[in-house]
From Swiss-Prot:
The keyword rRNA-binding does not apply. It is found in: Virion; Host cytoplasm. Keywords: Chaperone, Host cytoplasm, Phosphoprotein, Viral RNA replication, Virion. Signal peptide: none annotated. This is Phosphoprotein. Coiled coil: none annotated.
Length: 286
């Protein structure tokens, strides 16, 4: 069988059940409908459409329908309480006005209203949080600057205090040196002239000779200087304050140097007096 014969046979098989007396209808595009067959269709109004709603559908929609203002306010308060939100009077006024305008309101309307309120609250909280974070950052920067200034001032004050303390220590050392020199000169001038008193002083000095040796060592004198007769004469200028201060190691290196210089100066003055030339007696030969 050729292809043409096969095609005709397939077409007859496809439309074999269609009756031969079917008459086609002509449709024309009109302004009042998408497909207009010449007849006028009646379009139902919304009111007519509502009349055709069955009782079962109204019952289903009435499950969430709020018909009283008090019920609406009660529902709003319960939902707000569940979400931890305080009801505002302005919200009640807005919803009441909306209820009276539409004569009906659904619970879903209130849910969307609360979603809007919560969204606005979240945005406000986020903005406040950002503003607070910015203010805290500014305050932290200010406090950091203040802390740095305080630290710098503290360091400067410590340095100034150290300098003042060193200056005061130096002045105190000089003052002690002058005071000890004065006390030494007073001790020399007030030395007893009687033989008995002199012998008593010599006995006392001899008993403390070992301690004086230690005292002189702390000042930096060598052993041969300490044991010299001239040094023994210099011990009279050593005051109790000088002795205790040096032996207890309560003095500075500068003060030790001052004490040593005073003893050397005193020894030199004694040596000059001893070496002073004696005038020859013109009558010695007679």
């Amino acid at each position: 069988m050729d292809k043409k014969a096969s095609g005709i046979s397939g077409e007859n098989a496809l439309f074999g059940d269609v009756p031969n007396d079917v008459v086609g209808t002509t449709y024309e595009m009109g302004l009042d409908g998408i497909f207009d067959d010449g007849e006028t269709d009646v379009i139902e109004s919304p009111a007519d459409a509502e009349e055709h709603v069955t009782t079962d559908i109204v019952a289903d929609e009435g499950d969430n329908l709020i018909t009283k203002v008090d019920d609406m306010i009660g529902y709003l308060k319960r939902e707000c309480q569940d979400h931890g939100i305080a009801v505002r009077k302005e919200w009640v006024n807005v919803l009441t006005r909306k209820f009276h305008m539409s004569k009906k309101i659904y619970a879903s309307h209130l849910d969307f209203f609360l979603l809007g309120v919560m969204g606005e609250r979240h945005v406000a909280v986020e903005k406040d949080f950002k503003d607070t974070a910015v203010r805290l950052s500014d305050e932290v920067n200010k406090m950091s600057g203040i802390s740095k200034k305080v630290a710098d001032n503290e360091t400067r004050m410590i340095k100034e205090l150290d300098a003042k303390m060193k200056e005061m220590g130096s002045l105190i050392g000089k003052f002690n040196g002058v005071l000890n020199e004065f006390k030494g000169s007073m001790a020399v001038s007030s030395r007893p002239a009687s033989v008995a008193s002199w012998a008593l002083d010599q006995t006392t000095e001899t008993s403390r000779e070992k301690n004086y040796n230690e005292f002189l060592k702390k000042l930096g004198f060598q052993d041969h200087h300490i044991k010299s007769p001239l040094m023994k004469k210099c011990t009279v200028m050593i005051t109790d304050e000088m002795y205790d201060e040096v032996m207890l190691e309560n003095t500075s290196e500068d003060t030790l140097g001052i004490y040593k210089e005073q003893i050397i100066t005193y020894g030199q003055s004694i040596q000059k007096k001893v070496e002073k030339p004696i005038k020859k007696d013109p009558y010695a030969d007679f």
